[in-house]
Regions:
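N-terminal strand-loop element at the rim of the active site
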Residues: 6-13, 18-66, 252-253
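Membrane-proximal helix-turn-helix segments that form the acceptor-binding/catalytic region
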Residues: 106, 122-168
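A conserved mid-protein helix/loop that constitutes part of the nucleotide-sugar donor-binding site
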Residues: 18, 22, 212, 219-235, ...
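A short, well-ordered alpha-helix in the C-terminal region of glycosyltransferases
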Residues: 363-377
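Acidic donor-binding loop of glycosyltransferase active sites
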Residues: 290-304, 317
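Carbohydrate-associated surface elements
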Residues: 175, 195
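Nucleotide-activated donor-binding/catalytic signature segment of Leloir-type glycosyltransferases, i.e.
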Residues: 259-283
Length: 404
């Protein structure tokens, strides 16, 4: 097949771009022709495409006629990934039949988090529509700007409308399949999983100074629960009466608040130490996982998948996570980590789950082995076996309708 991958950025600025960096060489190796269509470039980041990759790349922001160039390449199918401009989506769907990979809540939530904050934080299962505008402020679904709210609503409404024009909707989890089924797309949605592989072999474990080592790896935002990771760590130190070190790796709007709070908590509880590293590249993130006893995934929002937990599991590190979204499809409670009830997401319950993991060394050893075994399900070969039929049936669906 001739496959055009369409995405927002040509550089590795997030999980979507990292996925594409893994997918492109695999599609080429499988005998497909691949081109890429990007809305923009971010030159300070590592590019998705290797310098010697036999792939035509079109960057819309730098091209006089990006859609004409896409059409001239004559793709069999467009495989879209989170374009920021709905007009770009619409134009590309005129070029060839389309498959969209819904990496997030594309077209089904104003804020994109599917999380309400009032009267208490919990995941939202509403079907997107005008009533979301009524609920937005009372439920604290997002920010306080009415202009931004209306703009985001318009964007998501346009995206939802465009989903009907795609031949198929690919998702990483059954949770996301259910989300799009609720919005009327049950016949189009296909679960294809994600390819997750380790960049380097796991390093030998080093118990170091005897402190328990916890790792939070992600955006420092309310929806991701970065604050819950910090508050749970100090409670764990108090519960265990033993040194606990928490490494927080990431960036976001809570950065300054978390640093100030950590400074206070480490003075109150001297058995707690906290290190902030900012974002880590793939290899440094892998090294951080190797030096951790547990990965903390305290997300309040229903993670579409939560690939960070599988990345850690491949390296033999279990996760403690709230039972939300797609997390429940890779984290098996008491087998590859601990699931904590998320209604509501409670610091005390989360800290108790962390302590329960750490107090039993035999349990930890058993779970580490199960993590490695379970995570091997998410190989690129398995992903391609699920994805290729979806792309093929989409490529020929429009042709079949035309002939009929």
């Amino acid at each position: 097949m001739r496959i055009t991958l369409a995405a927002h950025c040509s550089c590795r600025v997030g999980g979507v771009e990292q996925y594409l960096a893994t997918l492109v060489p695999s599609l080429l190796a499988a005998g497909h022709d691949v081109s890429c269509w990007f809305e923009t470039a971010a030159g300070e980041h590592e590019p998705i495409l290797a310098a010697d990759a036999p792939v035509e790349a079109i960057v819309a922001s730098e091209h006089r006629d990006p859609f004409g160039a896409a059409r001239a390449w004559r793709p069999d199918v467009i495989f879209a990934h989170g374009l920021s401009d709905a007009a770009h989506e619409r134009a590309l769907l005129d070029v060839a039949p389309g498959v969209i990979f819904a990496h997030d809540y594309h077209g089904t939530c104003i804020s994109g988090t599917k999380t309400i904050r009032a009267p208490r934080a919990r995941c939202c299962e509403r079907t997107f529509g005008p009533s979301c505008l009524v609920q937005y402020y009372p439920r604290h679904c997002g920010g306080w700007s009415p202009v931004t709210m209306v703009q985001l609503y318009g964007l998501q409404r346009a995206r939802l409308g465009l989903l009907a024009s795609y031949e198929r909707i690919a998702v990483a989890s059954r949770h996301m399949a259910e989300e799009y089924a609720r919005h009327g797309f049950a016949s189009k949605v296909r679960v294809v999983g994600l390819p997750i592989e380790s960049p380097v072999a796991p390093a030998a474990r080093d118990d170091g100074d005897g402190a328990w080592r916890l790792l939070y790896l992600g955006r420092l935002e309310f929806a991701k629960g970065a604050d819950l990771a910090l508050e749970s760590a100090v409670r764990t130190a108090a519960l265990m009466m033993r040194p606990v070190h928490l490494q927080i790796s990431g960036a976001g709007s809570l950065d300054a608040t978390l640093r100030a709070r950590a400074d206070h908590l480490t003075r109150v509880e001297p058995r707690l130490s906290v290190t902030f590293t900012g974002w880590l590249d793939q290899r440094k993130a892998a090294a951080a996982v190797d030096h951790s006893d547990l990965l903390l995934v305290p997300s309040r929002w229903p993670e579409p998948f939560g690939m960070v937990g599988v990345e850690a599991a491949l390296r033999g590190v279990p996760s403690v996570a709230f039972a939300v979204g797609g997390i429940r499809e890779w984290l098996i409670d008491d087998v590859t980590g601990r699931l904590v009830d998320a209604d509501p997401p409670c610091v005390d319950a989360y800290a108790a789950a962390i302590a329960a993991c750490l107090i039993d060394r035999r349990w930890l050893a058993r779970v580490r082995q199960h993590c490695r075994e379970s995570a091997t399900r998410f190989q690129i070969s398995s992903h391609l076996a699920a994805l290729e039929p979806v792309l093929a049936e989409s490529a020929y669906a429009r042709l079949a309708r035309t002939v009929a």
